[in-house]
Curated annotation (Swiss-Prot):
Transmembrane segments: none annotated. This is Neuron navigator 1. Residues 1-63, 115-230, 280-339, 391-463, 477-783, 800-840, 893-982, 1172-1202, 1242-1306, 1359-1381, 1808-1841 are annotated as: Disordered. The modification N-acetylmethionine is found at residue 1. Residues 280-291, 618-638, 648-658, 696-712, 726-735, 753-772, 1244-1259, 1365-1381 have a biased composition (Polar residues). PANTHER family: NEURON NAVIGATOR 1, STEERIN. May be involved in neuronal migration. The modification Phosphothreonine is found at residues 162, 537, 547, 575, 1004, 1168. Residues 479-489, 506-522, 558-569, 584-594 have a biased composition (Basic and acidic residues). GO terms for molecular function: ATP hydrolysis activity. The lineage of its organism: Eukaryota, Metazoa, Chordata, Craniata, Vertebrata.
Amino acid sequence: MLGSSVKSVQPEVELSGGSGSGGDEGADESRGASRKAAAADGRGMLPKRAKAAGGSGSMAKASAAELKVFKSGSVDSRVPGGLPTSNLRKQKSLTNLSFLTDSEKKLQLYEPEWSDDMAKAPKGLGKLGPKGRETPLMSKTLSKSEHSLFQPKGGSTGGAKTPLAPLAPSLGKPSRIPRGPYAEVKPLSKAPEAAVSDDGKSDDELLSSKAKAQKGSGTVPSAKGQEERAFLKVDPELVVTVLGDLEQLLFSQMLDPESQRKRTVQNVLDLRQNLEETMSSLRGSQVTHSSLEMPCYDSDDANPRSVSSLSNRSSPLSWRYGQSSPRLQAGDAPSVGGSCRSEGPPAWYMHGERAHYSHTMPMRSPSKLSHISRLELVESLDSDEVDLKSGYMSDSDLMGKTMTEDDDITTGWDESSSISSGLSDASDNLSSEEFNASSSLNSLPTTPTASRRSSTIVLRTDSEKRSLAESGLNWFSESEEKTPKKLEYDSGSLKMEPGTSKWRRERPESCDDASKGGELKKPISLGHPGSLKKGKTPPVAVTSPITHTAQSALKVAGKPEGKATDKGKLAVKNTGLQRSSSDAGRDRLSDAKKPPSGIARPSTSGSFGYKKPPPATGTATVMQTGSSATLSKIQKSSGIPVKPVNGRKTSLDVSNSVEPGFLAPGARSNIQYRSLPRPAKSSSMSVTGRGGPRPVSSSIDPSLLSTKQGGLTPSRLKEPSKVASGRSTPAPVNQTDREKEKAKAKAVALDSDNISLKSIGSPESTPKNQASHPPATKLAELPPTPLRATAKSFVKPPSLANLDKVNSNSLDLPSSSDTHASKVPDLHAPSSSTGGPLPSCFTPSPAPILNINSASFSQGLELMSGFSVPKETRMYPKLSGLHRSMESLQMPMSLPSAFPSSAPIPTPPTAPSEEDTEELPWSGSPRAGQLDSSQRDRNTLPKKGLRYQLQSQEETKERRHSHTAGGLPESDDQAELPSPPALSMSLSAKGQLTNIVSPTAATTPRITRSNSIPTHEAAFELYSGSQMGSTLSLAERPKGMIRSGSFRDPTDDVHGSVLSLASSASSTYSSAEERMQSEQIRKLRRELESSQEKVATLTSQLSANANLVAAFEQSLVNMTSRLRHLAETAEEKDTELLDLRETIDFLKKKNSEAQAVIQGALNASEATPKELRIKRQNSSDSISSLNSITSHSSIGSSKDADAKKKKKKSWVYELRSSFNKAFSIKKGPKSASSYSDIEEIATPDSSAPSSPKLQHGSTETASPSIKSSTSSSVGTEVTETPAHSVPHTRLFQANEEEEPEKKEVSELRSELWEKEMKLTDIRLEALNSAHQLDQLRETMHNMQLEVDLLKAENDRLKVAPGPSSGCTPGQVPGSSALSSPRRSLGLALSHPFSPSLTDTDLSPMDGISTCGSKEEVTLRVVVRMPPQHIIKGDLKQQEFFLGCSKVSGKVDWKMLDEAVFQVFKDYISKMDPASTLGLSTESIHGYSLSHVKRVLDAEPPEMPPCRRGVNNISVALKGLKEKCVDSLVFETLIPKPMMQHYISLLLKHRRLVLSGPSGTGKTYLTNRLAEYLVERSGREVTDGIVSTFNMHQQSCKDLQLYLSNLANQIDRETGIGDVPLVILLDDLSEAGSISELVNGALTCKYHKCPYIIGTTNQPVKMTPNHGLHLSFRMLTFSNNVEPANGFLVRYLRRKLVESDSDVNANKEELLRVLDWVPKLWYHLHTFLEKHSTSDFLIGPCFFLSCPIGIEDFRTWFIDLWNNSIIPYLQEGAKDGIKVHGQKAAWEDPVEWVRDTLPWPSAQQDQSKLYHLPPPSVGPHSTASPPEDRTVKDSTPNSLDSDPLMAMLLKLQEAANYIESPDRETILDPNLQATL
């Protein structure tokens, strides 16, 4: 890992116990050695993976991964095992430094011994021992080749990990050490432990001896390895981190052989201890001491702390200060921030935030290299995510980006966490600054950071560090890239191409996988060191830890299930490595952010406080939904519960518990290492998995993925899945270290929990998470909510995730202002910033952070301000940490920010869930936020992987959040850090980061464990079984278990990773004294950590409480406003109802009065007609109006609910429509004979006024809406109202005065009146019920239409670059309706009513449909062709889109006919401007709506059109049944007269030959004619009814034989049904002779012969002889005349109409481009006529593949021209010269093309078009080089034209070049010129 390249021979080690351990027996010696060790042990040595595999016993031997070491000339040391350095790949970058871990150095010093250790399981590693270190193939001896780590594909599983440390030393060469100015690490007694911790920690070791670990240092981490069956894939970040440690080790080695020896011994002891602890952890007993040891080492001295020195983090300070610490891992943001960002040519720069980062990042010079890597990554990301928007920025930057790109990156890794872990590492080096970077700070305890920093500093001066960073960082960058390659399976995205100096992200695969995974892609990009640019890769790296588990699961998922399982294991192991890588990446990030971090808050206690929050972040697990299936599975039920902490607990515990203070020095180193491991995880993820997991979390809940153990992941990220596995494997390696830390942290169980959370969050939240981790357990419950709360603000923005992606990045910049975390804006920004600005923040000086804040931050703030977050910022001053947390929560946001375009792609599926989750937490359940955190936690803690599984996805998310939370306080202030809010503000509280760092140290191992135990691992399952993942807090859960994924005794000091550490310790520590000392130190550290954790926990609790309160207050405010709004609306509705009721009552009253009046009038013989009329009308009208009102009130209320948009106006409309219907129905009966008497009494005139009268009387109580509706219904007769205001009393008096003679008449009339009223009532009731039913149906229908419209609009928006300014006339209405369905609905509501009020001829059903008419319906008009499958392989278009038509809901058949005619007319005018086809509206036979068919010439159907649920009109054109060819003309685009001519020729002569140039559509036409003939014959369609002969493939003899048999069959008249109706002869070579052949063979009666249609490309030369038996009629197709001449124009225009042109922004430009194509074709045709032969012409079909879209057209045309047209023209010109000689002056057609290119940016593309050189006179004359050059350029590309011609061109070219070998030199310059 340190300098060596490790190749994973067996990238996919079995995740299961070691099922694949034996698989690689044939692998390298190293692999074999590993294997032997594994065999000896009986289980895979992949410590992490193995552990994950489940139980120590379950660890099968993973096939030893083969670590290939390349022995660079500079490096003298040889691989210990004698492994040939040949396996090592030279590092291509400057960073080919070979870094040795302390243990490695020792190994080098004592190679034989180390070799032994490596080959054999260290004695102390008894449990892991089986793997032994048979093959020290570790990449420890890093050559100058690409700094790829050895990736033991299987060996690593087997215990390759154990040898990690040893291998590293053996491989590492002192000569290498000098490569970078690395600070020397004094070989402290703890240094060996560090080395061991490398092994044990897996994180550090992975980092330091990633290659080594991969190689198969399975011995120490054997148990782990077994669990994490997966081979260790080295993350570039990990590699960088490891390089840092190695460099330290190397320096120490160089310093003093004795000290080195001691260190080596210590390392061995540590490894042994780790192994033992891991084993015990597997057994469920947790050994905290190992974990503690690691942290101790970290704190005690960076030097001894091999991890510290090895990890790039150990030099984070240097990084931070701009020195080149190889540690720029997860925390390497600075490098990106400064160098990268400023350079930021890749996607990084795309975002302003990035630019800010670059400013911000005084980060290490290495940042340039890393920047380059990142750029690479960015490039990958660009394809994947957006421009790698998140680049490896600071944590905050990452966070912002990740949040923005939440799906991909966020999910993939807790950017904050991952970066934070990376930052933590950096923090270790730069304690105070590191603390400033909340995320990375969180990863590393502040104090440990200082310690580490000190050690790092000790090892290197700032300049030294810088140099180191430059070379190391570069190396790291490459290493990261390389690591990704190693992590190929781990992080597909990180795959590095061996040949490339930069890490090439094979990530396209991974990315694709990630993409598939949903987010993986982005993470993958992150994986790249270049990608690692703060924003993207670091996020990946950061995310890796968080997502690691998820990633593992994802990875597993990505692969086949079986493989997935393997991978799960591998994932664990890889995770470790990846974590290392991640750490490296993180380091960069953290470095970038760390300076601010340290500045912001170096206090360890704060960090611990954060640790607690990380558990809270556990809740964030939900967020990680996409990321890890396991997470989702493990996800704690208690989203907030401390459990999430468990996920990361191991790591956290170690740092936390062991030493709050210890964290400062050792812990920091440890944490750094841990962070590194976490980054490794994240790195792996980062490369592939990281992006994958986090993206997964967005798309595929990592939790889910983990749970499935690859079940889910596969879809999400096959490669990422791989990555995850790889990552997991590395995790164990790192885990050893981490485990030790975890063991310590274990002591501080709660702290540990927090840390573990932090670890998980390491990618972005690692610092946060870790910081939160210490308090995680305690704060777990509270912080989750605060985190949630803080996150919530961000989370909501994440809801805007895609949009917010950019915002998030911007915000990330603010995060960099963790220092100003206290600022409200900062708070806000930090959240975003966490991802992005953090790198800036982490710049050595706070100023850079500010810088970030200023530019990125402002941007982020603006974006954020868009969110609720900005305000929240105030609430959470430490939001920077929170932002991190938010990042985890907001991952979707952050990622989206980073990759607005890509995030939506990955994020939409994943991000949404994450966003939802986040939002959920924010809104009501802290769990959601915590879940996200949890996920992070999980990622952070490999061990947690099991837990993750156990925990539900929620828990995973929780953990993530916790992580974030932890980091948050760190950035703002330590005090806040402890509180849950602090958790939210992990980024903010950078000071606390120190504490967090300490927990981080512990966490890191945990993270490693988590990695080692991928969510998919059996170990994970174990966890779930024990519920440790979900229920146990980190403290509760055994560290060993957490770490290794096996159940360890919680009391055990060693985590799962610790087990590895223990084994490594045993191997490292040669003397018990050293071991005892280290144990004591660890214990002291653990105590310090515990106290720090307690402080941090309290602080975190305070902060969390504050955040909770703020969140609750905010939610209360929101709820209050909502309630107020609801109350207001309820009141309005109540008042409306009251008004209506009053009106109804009043009308009832009036009705009764009117009835009395009417009765009086009827009784009174002399009542005035007017009065009678009035009375009668009153009664009738009142009934109608009453009924209408009643129906309105009943319907209206439901309608009101259905159409919330309607306010009072809706009532008016409603009433109006009801009145209208009532009146129209009433009037209908009035005209009936039965109504004649009544009419005498009350004419419609009086009836109308009477209604107004009632209305008039009721004006006081009636609502204005009723009044207006009544008056409107009354219409002009309202003026009569005054006449009806006669007092009722007077009417009654008049009635009484009536003469009695008329009483009989009155009685009869009254009876009639009553009956009529009853009848009217019944009708009105029926109408009302029908009305209601219809209304409900219409409402449903309208809603369905709206949904469909919105879907269509959404699809369009996805496809279209933006809203189009223009659209085709037919579609304008549709598009407007889509754009504003609400507005169009409102308009539609107003129009339909007016007609309904005035229309008295409506039938009852029509009246019912008036409600539906409220909305216009957009109908899609298509021409449907009858499906015919007559000709095999002939695919023809079934539907032709004509356009859209808007019709009201109350349309009738006549209106619909007109609408269809208009659409068809518009279509024809657009498609055929010259009207050559002869089609018109007369061509339409009919159309169908749903199942209702409308034939135009017949009577329209009785059912009205436009029933509900119909939005498609299928138009049928006239065809054979109507004795027309319009349908055929429409389909073939051949003018109607010509089509009729062809058919008449066929029917008359039965034989037809079509001749003309190729590409004129002859074959297509023959197929259509054959179908027409079959249809016309009426015969049953069978397979043989049309027989096709291709004369290219079949000879004339075959045809003759076939025809003779056919003639015999016909003559015998047997089986006529089997005789084909049509015979198609395609590609006749000699059309003239075919006539004789057919006539000779087909001797049967002419009218019985089949139709024969032939095609030929050659002009038919008719001789007089042929004319004698011209049984064939010849049709010549010419490009100069129809149909070929206008076909292209019509075809392209049809394509434009059908392509939904309103998607295209500029229609005019597109039309100009499409109209230019026929001109180009004609120009080329003219050229060939001049310079070629008559049969070598170019047809229109050459251009039919033209895409609709200017940008697509551009690339399509350039490719077509250079690869198809130029070779075709060349061949034609050659033929022309051969046949005719030089016919005309030569003109290069490219000149005309270049001058007329129609698209806007044509000038840039002119030079891309190849020239057509004049053909040489002689075939081989020297005058033809230019032509040959062009042929050479274009021929290799597939020619669109005849493949035969392509072959001939190649043959000719070969002949030319063979004959003139010197031509190459002549052609090269020209070739370059053309290119």
